[in-house]
Amino acid sequence: MSERYPRIRLRTRFGGYWIHEGLRLDFYMRRPHTQMARAVMRSMDTYVNAVGVENFAFYVDEEGDPQELDAEGWALNRRKLLEVRWPRVILEEASTGAPERYHFEYQGRRIDDPELPVSAKHACVASFWLPSEYLEEHGPE
């Protein structure tokens, strides 16, 4: 096994990057969102506090459009996590023309509703992205 991971960088002609290595942690939870909401909010808060709230500038609204992640945007997304039966929350960093480094995404599912045809593969999913530089700075601890 190598001590170093491969650097994967595809440069644009303007000096930025289209592709950049990093780590994406996806958690698939076979539990109804109603049982997961508070734990997901704590996880989101822990992640945002660890990487810095300043790294997030937008959230994605119900139409799929980016909206400014100001105090009102934070409150709206927290309410969605706690009050909506199957929320979708996406937090993104400011668009700089570079690949995203920090990203949080959660898709809640109603897997406990007997009225809905539910696949055995359905689950709530939380995703946390970290750039390789963050991992190098903070080490394995």
Which residues does each PLM region occupy?
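C-terminal interaction module
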Residues: 1-58, 140-141
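Internal, hydrophobic cores of structured domains that mediate oligomerization or house catalytic pockets
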Residues: 43-45, 50-140
